[in-house]
Amino acid sequence: MKLYKIILSVGFWLLTTQLTSAQENNFMPYDQAILGSPLSFKMVPIQGGEFTIGSAANEKGRNADEGPQKKLSISAFWMSAYEVTRDELDIFLKDESTSLNVSVDAITRPSPQYVDLSLGMGKQGGYPANSMSQRTAIMYCKWLYQKTKIFYRLPTEAEWEYACKAGTNTAYFFGNNAADLDTYAWYEKNSENTFHKVGKKLANPWGLYDMIGNMTEWTLDHYDATAFEKINNEQLLIAANDAKYPKTLKGGSFIDPAIELRSAKRFHSDPIWNRRDPQIPKSKWWLTEAKQVGIRLVRPFLEPTEEEIKQFFKAYLNL
């Protein structure tokens, strides 16, 4: 199993950076227009800081892979206020200026879905994009970079959990009482087995909607059940991994019970998510058994160089 050593560097990833006054003035919420369309998406600033990743040993529903808890330092970034919608993703899917080949250096447009993987739950008007592979999610980020000249990517697991917890240490960002979930999340009990338009529940304390429930969200990380045991010096080092499975997801979804929506809960991808795909070889782009999987974007405050961005996409799309 090969690890691509692009260990995520200072300012680019997880080392805390104190922002200057001038930088603070530029670290504001903004709306990112998607060129060639009337659509935009909102980005929320997330200040850097320290937090404790994982769950307490006595947290109800805790799994062994959520520990041991470790303190991490996180650098500043923006995160999308909402999950990426199908309306937004469709602009990429229908962009005929992109390639249909599989070159790593090209912006490669995913092949069409074999069947409608929204399964009648909703596509236009603010419904979340679903059933895409991690590769599709990262290629969408590469396409956005081409269109906007701004580097967007998936969050690391640590960034995601830091943003979800929003300064809290409880099972959920609103406390420990799962009875309050209806206010913040679509999950097994209230979803009627369908995903819902983004942003219809209350946001977490940092202004992020649907962080728990609705869609389980991809992160960059390869899943390792013992990852937290390997954290040293308050840093979680991430490298691109050429194994297709398993990758880490966070947040729980509309099909999950309340206990699965805890901030520290970890999910991982599984080959059975493509079990019903009739194509040979099976699609790199779509997951026939993962109707609950979606994405959310981040943008590091300190922009990496053009060469670093090139190496990032080369590593993560050469899987």
Where are these regions (language model features)?
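Disulfide-stabilized, aromatic/cysteine-rich ligand-recognition loop
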Residues: 23-24, 28, 202-204, 234-319
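Active-site microenvironments of metalloenzymes and redox enzymes
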Residues: 53-60, 73-174, 221-228, 299-319
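Bacterial N-terminal signal peptides that target proteins for export
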Residues: 1-8
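Mature N-terminal segment immediately following signal peptide/propeptide cleavage
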Residues: 39-53
